[in-house]
A protein has these predicted regions:
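N-terminal nucleotide-binding beta1-loop-alpha1 segment
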Residues: 1-26, 55, 207
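Structural beta-sheet core signal
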Residues: 10-12, 57-58, 104-105, 130-132, ...
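Short catalytic helix/loop segments, enriched in acidic residues and glycine
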Residues: 27-42
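Short, structured coil segments at secondary-structure junctions
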Residues: 28, 52, 73-74
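Residues in the short beta-alpha loop(s) of Rossmann-like NAD(P)-binding domains
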Residues: 38, 60-64
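A short, N-terminal amphipathic alpha-helix
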Residues: 38-55, 69-70
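Conserved beta-loop-beta/alpha segment of the NTase-like Rossmann-fold superfamily
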Residues: 65-154
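Catalytic-core segments of class I nucleotidyltransferases/pyrophosphorylases
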Residues: 104, 119-123, 153-235
């Protein structure tokens, strides 16, 4: 039994500058990088559709017209984030279009090879902010950086998240937050413009849960992850 009265809408933030993989971006858009025959943006939309989500909002930028062009007749809503002011601001832009309520946040620069994480989130949601989490225990984890590391987990309750250390490799065997989540109104009640500090506050309040999935997780948003993704699907 889930905490969903109805399937939530989803948001795909695609307005960022993509500085981590500028060398591979297509027309200035990391979301249009092609992996396994489809753009990362299309992979993300299909994942959400296959999870049963019908209302999808893509947050683009007036400086990234190629995104809008790629989505012509695709059946998704498009809104623009005037400036690249971060993830929380991007989702706020989508909320202006869709209104309040639970929303599934899906970053378009990550891939899950063996599972539909959005479907798992919907099936496990019980009313609290819920994050898709993987254990970095395979060769695939070598392309990850030390961000989003969970340092205390009891059952499925997240109690502590580490600081970001993007210059370090992610520690093998540790749990990592990924680019999928359901944000509830409790997230917005904290009125914090930084998603990491908001998640930490929710964790300290006992209001943050983990959906742990067993899959290879690829961060295509960095050059090493991009190369790994290409080698994975071309092997």
């Amino acid at each position: 039994m889930t905490g969903l009265e109805s399937t939530p809408w989803a948001v795909i933030p695609a307005a960022g500058l993509g500085t981590r993989m500028a060398e591979n971006a297509v027309l200035g858009c990391k979301e249009l990088v092609v992996v396994n025959g489809k753009t990362m943006l299309e992979h993300t939309i299909l994942e959400l559709e296959n999870a049963g989500i019908e209302q999808i909002v893509v947050v683009s930028s007036p400086n990234k017209p190629a995104i809008d062009k790629a989505l012509v007749d695709r059946g998704v809503e498009i809104v623009h984030q005037a400036e690249p002011n971060g993830l929380v601001d991007a989702v706020k832009c989508a909320r202006k279009k869709m209104g309040e309520g639970d929303c599934l946040v899906a970053l378009p620069d990550v891939m899950f090879t063996n599972v539909n994480p959005s479907l798992e989130l919907l099936s496990e949601f019980k009313g609290e902010t819920l994050l898709t989490v993987v254990r970095a225990d395979g060769a695939w984890a070598t392309q990850l950086r030390d961000t989003g590391r969970i340092t205390e987990l009891q059952g499925h309750k997240i109690h502590r998240i580490s600081s970001k250390n993007p210059d370090r490799a992610f520690p093998k065997g540790e749990l990592r937050i990924t680019g999928r989540a359901i944000w509830t109104e409790a997230f917005w009640d904290l009125k914090d413009d930084c998603e990491v500090s908001t998640l930490r506050k929710l964790a300290s309040m006992g209001k943050l849960s983990a959906s742990i999935v067993k899959t290879e997780y690829i961060d295509v948003g960095n050059s090493k992850g991009y190369r790994y993704a290409q080698s994975f699907f071309n092997r």
